[in-house]
């Protein structure tokens, strides 16, 4: 390349840089400092803060160690599958870290004694039980904009009744009103959620579409807007019961990460939700320990580091509950082998995925 061509290239690049600097200074004068910047200039834009779900397996399945702050998360599933339990666990974890949490109880069904059993400090938890959907979302917007809230839970999207529907007759048709309400609210909320670094969890219910011959007839309420705005979507299902002799003492639960903008999606994790206790930590340590090669299972016997823990899963869980030092050691080794465990959780869109994922 000749010297004349080199000078031309340098002149072009200098002109481009000057034009860019002029554009950036004009934008900052018009909209304020910080309205535009290089992506790596702010650490909090690169490093995502997370809040644990209360489930070690689900934290690993999410790929980043928990639910991302400054983002929208949707948890949906059938009735009594553990949606509110999972949200309350996230609140408890945030409170342990010194955070302030709020719960918008549109269903008017939050049980304070159950929340306390899960580790929630109900004396510090802000709660609102609004009458109309507009009121609920306005309260949520005000709390998020304050910048003082770490976790905000809306339970549930299906219970956010538009005011026009409340004031109308029982048989009136309000086509698309709920979906429009959610779409408008999310357009307003999404910017302030990111700026305030608040985790907003929307709990949602599922419905069946009429006349679907092929594919999955299930859908979530509130239209399509939430599916687009959510960074993480969790499909939670009850897959069985846990019995102590003839008494049912808990549920076996499966969670699928249906959408994940932060890490690879479609990971599936199973854990126990015990009545009055929530997610069983010791049950997870056994299951994940086997996947990570930390806990050995031979027949009905569980053993760790050459020591027999117990015969049968429930006996092994009791042993770990009574020996917290061993439980902590197993947890540390599982966290050390998190990559191996995450690979074992990887599902596919087809296997219990797109075919069974509500649209």
Curated annotation (Swiss-Prot):
One of its GO terms (cellular component) is cytosol. InterPro entries: AAA+_ATPase, DNA_recomb/repair_RecA, DNA_recomb/repair_RecA_CS, P-loop_NTPase, RecA-like_C, RecA-like_N, RecA_ATP-bd, RecA_C_sf. It comes from the Bacteria. The gene is recA. It is found in: Cytoplasm. GO terms for biological process: DNA recombination; DNA repair; SOS response. CDD domains: RecA (cd00983). GO terms for molecular function: ATP binding; ATP hydrolysis activity; ATP-dependent DNA damage sensor activity; damaged DNA binding; single-stranded DNA binding. ATP binds at residues 77-84. It comes from Azospirillum lipoferum (strain 4B). Disruption phenotype: Cells are more sensitive to UV and MMS, and have no detectable recombinase activity. They are still able to generate phase variants, as do wild-type cells, and surprisingly do so at a 10-fold greater rate. Phase variants irreversibly lose the ability to swim, and undergo changes in their sugar assimilation profile. Keywords: ATP-binding, Cytoplasm, DNA damage, DNA recombination, DNA repair, DNA-binding, Nucleotide-binding, SOS response. Can catalyze the hydrolysis of ATP in the presence of single-stranded DNA, the ATP-dependent uptake of single-stranded DNA by duplex DNA, and the ATP-dependent hybridization of homologous single-stranded DNAs. It interacts with LexA causing its activation and leading to its autocatalytic cleavage. This is Protein RecA. Belongs to the RecA family.
């Amino acid at each position: 390349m000749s010297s004349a061509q080199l000078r031309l290239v340098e002149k072009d690049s200098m002109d481009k840089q000057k034009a860019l600097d002029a554009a950036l200074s004009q934008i900052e004068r018009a909209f304020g400092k910080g309205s535009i910047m290089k992506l790596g200039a702010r650490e909090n834009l690169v490093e995502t803060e997370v809040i644990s779900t209360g489930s070690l397996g689900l934290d690993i399945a999410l790929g980043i160690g928990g639910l991302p702050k400054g983002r929208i998360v949707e948890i949906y599933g059938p009735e009594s599958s553990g949606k509110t339990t999972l949200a309350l666990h996230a609140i408890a974890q945030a409170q342990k870290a010194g955070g302030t949490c709020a719960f918008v109880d549109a269903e008017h069904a939050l049980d304070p004694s159950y929340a306390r059993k899960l580790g929630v400090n109900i004396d510090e938890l802000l709660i609102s039980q609004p009458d109309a959907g507009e009121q609920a979302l306005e309260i949520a917007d005000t709390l998020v904009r304050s910048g003082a809230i770490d976790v905000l839970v809306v339970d549930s999207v299906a219970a956010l009744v538009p005011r026009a529907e409340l004031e109308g007759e029982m048989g009136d048709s309000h086509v698309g009103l709920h979906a429009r309400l959610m779409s408008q609210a999310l357009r307003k909320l999404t910017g302030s959620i990111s700026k305030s670094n608040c985790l907003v969890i929307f709990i949602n219910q599922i419905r069946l579409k009429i006349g679907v011959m092929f594919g999955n007839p299930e859908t979530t309420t509130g239209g399509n807007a939430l599916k687009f705005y959510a960074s993480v979507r969790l499909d939670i299902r009850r897959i069985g019961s846990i019995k102590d002799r003839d008494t049912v003492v808990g549920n076996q639960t499966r969670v699928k990460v249906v959408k994940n903008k932060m890490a690879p999606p479609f990971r599936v994790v199973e854990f126990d939700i015990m009545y009055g206790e929530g997610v069983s930590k010791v049950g997870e340590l056994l299951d994940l320990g086997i996947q990570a090669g930390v806990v050995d299972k031979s027949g009905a016997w569980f053993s760790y580091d050459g020591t027999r823990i117990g015969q049968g899963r429930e006996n092994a869980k009791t042993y770990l509950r009574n020996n917290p030092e061993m439980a902590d050691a197993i947890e540390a080794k599982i966290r050390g082998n998190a990559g191996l465990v995450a690979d074992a959780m990887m599902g596919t869109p087809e296997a219990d995925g797109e075919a069974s994922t509500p649209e």
